[in-house]
């Protein structure tokens, strides 16, 4: 799976541009502030209908423009081309089109174009709140388990109903019990999918990490969000009074976490910034391998400022792992010489220079294997 064409209009400082990227490695280079990251942001918009740089829409849309648009053609794993498009307006409205038809949700984009982002904010996967690690986990499950999304939607609905009742007390006991049962059933299914995914992810992650850095004491464990020896419905019943006092449900898969520890301690508190980056990269590359194994296509990797925090040895090791995935990669950097020679001679590498928002292809190296 790869993007064969990307057209961008009115995204930040970028001039209107149509790119024909390599199916494998694409390096975008230029000075800081030139617009390199904005190219990755445009692709991210195309795949997820949102920016990774801003929760607000306004900064993404070019000054004095009413909307930004991104179109792309994706070559799917079955060899069929799919056309994607997204337009986002200043008022917040957005239109998603897939093969000429309006899409119902951003989930359809995500399924068609799986994206993995590695950028300076990726440290939050280790340092941030459990919600960030749940999102990482659920992204992986979503892309390998087609039954996950409808169950996750059931869970969210049941959780909203229960939390509303906890705050306002407007459900009769029978309705309350029914929603507790639904929440418990959906939670057990979500837990099973997550647990199965972690069991598959751990050995791939450990093997990938070993290629990057020696951290033998680093462990990955899963906490499901409630006592592993108790049924959730019992936990909900016993914690009802406290939940009412707090105004929300305190136990359940919405409290799950992926715990990353080194010698028994929170890894984020011990690892250097460079080591943290390598751990995050290993996690995201491992996810890519699982998607490949599930035969649901391949990820497209967006790697912002790959050289930062890494010495040459680790930089080259990371390039090799990305290359071995056999997927499409977009990488930004200031100095292209740091990455230009990190690939095999038969790997197609496209180089794009970005200057003051203008993107121009400068070189294509190698040929598709």
Swiss-Prot record:
Top-rank taxon: Bacteria
The family this protein is said to belong to: Belongs to the RecF family.
Function: The RecF protein is involved in DNA metabolism; it is required for DNA replication and normal SOS inducibility. RecF binds preferentially to single-stranded, linear DNA. It also seems to bind ATP.
Organism: Pseudomonas paraeruginosa (strain DSM 24068 / PA7)
Any one Gene Ontology cellular component term annotated for this protein: cytoplasm
Sites where the protein binds ATP: 30-37
Gene3D superfamilies: P-loop containing nucleotide triphosphate hydrolases, RecF/RecN/SMC, N-terminal domain
Protein name: DNA replication and repair protein RecF
Protein localization: Cytoplasm
GO molecular function, one term: single-stranded DNA binding
GO-annotated biological processes: DNA replication; DNA synthesis involved in DNA repair; double-strand break repair; SOS response
Transmembrane region(s): none
Predominant location category: cytoplasm
Source organism phylogeny: Bacteria, Pseudomonadati, Pseudomonadota, Gammaproteobacteria, Pseudomonadales
Gene that encodes it: recF
Record key words, sorted: ATP-binding, Cytoplasm, DNA damage, DNA repair, DNA replication, DNA-binding, Nucleotide-binding, SOS response
